[in-house]
C-alpha cells in the first residue's frame, strides 16, 4: 500500500497516467469498442434551465470547460513567477514570448513554402503553429526532477503565449462571426474581476461566479472559451489582506484535480483517432509534409533560433545554470501539436476528407516524433 501511495505521489506518475490514457483512447477507437467510445464522448449533456441552457457533447464540455481550469492553473503559476519568482526580470519573461513567436512564424512559413500552389491546402497554414500544452507538460512530468524548474517554467510560459497566439489566429482567420453582445459581457466580467482584485477580495466563490459568466460569454462570443481560465488567473490576488499566501493555496487545491483527473480525461477524450483507413504513403503528400516538417522541425528550430537571437541581442536571457543543449530539448517538445493542431485542422478543412485523413495522420506522426525524440534527448543530454 505504501509503495502504491509513493508511486501515485511521484512526479512522474501524472505523466504516465496521461500517456496511458492516450494509448487507451487509440486502442478503443481502433477496435470493436470504437462505436461505444465515440457515442460516449459525443453524447449530449445540457446544463441550465428554461431559455438559459448550454447543450454540448461530452468531449466539448471537456475541451471547452475542464481545460479552462487547466489554463487557470497555468496562468496562476505564471503570474506568481512573473511577480515574485524566476520571471521577475523583463528579459526572463521576454524569452518565452520570443520563443512563441518563432514557434508560430517558422512552421507557418515551412507549410506555406510546400503548399503555396494549392489554395485549399493553404487554409491549414496554422496547423503546425500550435503546441499541445497538456501533452508537453505530460512528457515533462515523465522526466520528473531531471528537468530544472526554470526549464519547466519556460515551457509552460511559452505554451501559454503560444496558445494565446493560437486563439488570436482562430479568432482572426477561422471564426465565421464574433458576437458583439457576448464580447461586451466578457468586458463587464473582466471589469468585475478587476474590482475584486483592487479591493483585495479573497472569497473564491465570487471569482468562481464571475468566472462562470465570463466562460459562458466567451463560449458564445466565438473566441475560444479556455481563454477565460487565463483571464481569471490574472485577477486572483497573490496574498490575503493579512499578507497570507492566497494564490498558492488556490493552486494547491486545484493542482491534484488537474493532474489526476482533468488531463487524463482530456487525453482519453481527444487521442481517439481512427487510423485504420490511413495509408502511410499519404505522409508524402504536400499537406502532410507541410504539417510534419512544420511541427517537428519548424517548431523546434523556430523557438530555438528566435530565443538565441533575442539572447544575443540582450533582449532576453537564458535561465540561470542552463546550457543551450538542455534548452534545445525543451524546444523539441514544443512540436507536440496533437489536440490543438487537430482542433485547428478541423476548423481549416471543416472536417473535409479531401486529403483522406493524411492531415490527421501527419499531426499524429509529428507530435509523437516530437514527444519521443524530445524525451530521449532530455534523458541523455546533461
Curated annotation (Swiss-Prot):
Keywords assigned: Antiport, Cell inner membrane, Cell membrane, Ion transport, Membrane, Sodium, Sodium transport, Transmembrane, Transmembrane helix, Transport
Subcellular location: Cell inner membrane
Keyword Kinase: no
NCBIfam families hit by this protein: NhaA, PRK09560.1, PRK09561.1
A GO molecular-function annotation: sodium:proton antiporter activity
Protein name, per record: Na(+)/H(+) antiporter NhaA 2
A Pfam family hit: Na_H_antiport_1
GO biological process: regulation of pH
Reactions performed catalytically: Na(+)(in) + 2 H(+)(out) = Na(+)(out) + 2 H(+)(in)
Organism per entry: Campylobacter jejuni subsp. jejuni serotype O:23/36 (strain 81-176)
GO CC terms: plasma membrane
Record-stated family: Belongs to the NhaA Na(+)/H(+) (TC 2.A.33) antiporter family.
